[in-house]
Amino acid sequence: MNVAIIGCGYVGTAVARHWHRDRRYQITATTTTPERTSELEQVAQRVIVAKGDDETALKAVVQNQDAIVLSIAPKFSLAANSYEATYLHTAKNLVKVLQQAPSVKQLIYTGSYSVYGNKNGAWVDEESPLTPANQNGEILVQTEQVLLAAANENLKVCIFRLGGIYGSGRELTKIFSRAFGSTRPGTGEDFSNWIHLDDIVAAVDFAVALQLQGIYNLVIDEPRSSRDLLDRLSQKYSLPTVMWDPSAQEVRPYNARVSNQKIKAAGYSFIHPQIMI
C-alpha cells in the first residue's frame, strides 16, 4: 500500500515510524525543513521537501498513492496569517492536486477539538455546532470544510478532531513546566481534553484499515479540569502547587467536554483511555 504523510512533525513522524515496521506500506514523507530529510529517510522510502503553497511538489507527493495523511501545524507562530497559510492554503492546494490523482482512495486529516470553541464545560459530540472562539479556530473550521467537500465516491475523507497531544517527548510535566509554582487566572474549573500519541497513531492505522470517512473526536474518556490535572501532576512529581486567582478571570476558548463515543462505536479501543499522569 502506498501512503503519503504530509507533515512529519511529532504526529506524522510517529505514524511513519509505525508504518515503517510493516512491510505492506511504501511511505512518502514530507517536510518543510530540508535538514530533516536524512532523519525521515530512516522511516520512509521517499522524502519530499514540500510546502503547502507548492502545487508542483504536492502533485508529486500524491501521485500513485492509495492514502494521504495530512498532519500539519504552524512552525513557530500562532498568528492568523500563519494558520491560514499552514492549514487552509495547504488544504485548498491539496484538494486541487487530488483531482488529478485518482489512485488516492482516502484522505485522513488530524485536526483539533478547538473548533467547538467555549461551551462552558458542556458535553459536545461530532454533531454539535462549531463556535470557534478566535480567528485561528475559524481557519480550522474552514480547513475541515474544504477537505470534507472533496469527498466523493472515489475519495473517502476522515477528519480526527484531536485533543491536546501528549506522549513520549511531550510529557504533561513538560507542557505545563511554567505553570508549577505560579498563580493562574480563573478557578481552574475549565475542562481540557487530551489524547496520547500512541492513540493517534493507532487511530490513523484503524482508519486506514476500515476506510473510515467522516468526523471523529479523538480524546480520552474523561476530560479533566485544569485544576485537577495540575494538582495531580504536582502531587505525583512533588512539584510546586499551582495557585488560582478567581478575581483575574480569563475566558478559556476551548472549555468543553468532548465525547469519544463515535470512534468507539466504530470499533476503536483506546490504548490510553484515561490520561497518563
Regions found by a protein language model. Name each.
Residues V11:
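Hydrophobic/small residue at the entry helix of a nucleotide-binding pocket
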Residues T32-T37, E41, Q45-V97:
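NAD(P)H-binding glycine-rich loop region in Rossmannoid oxidoreductase-like domains
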Residues A50-E55, E250-I277:
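C-terminal amphipathic/interface module of NAD(P)-dependent oxidoreductases
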Residues N93-A133:
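Conserved Rossmann-fold NAD(P)-dependent oxidoreductase catalytic core, especially the SDR/UDP-sugar
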Residues N120-I159:
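Catalytic helix-loop patch of NAD(P)-dependent Rossmann-fold dehydrogenases
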Residues L148-F191:
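NAD(P)-dependent short-chain dehydrogenase/reductase
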Residues T173-T183, E189-Y216:
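Alpha-helical substrate-binding/gating segment
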Residues A203-Y254:
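Mid/C-terminal beta-alpha module of Rossmann-like enzyme folds, strongest
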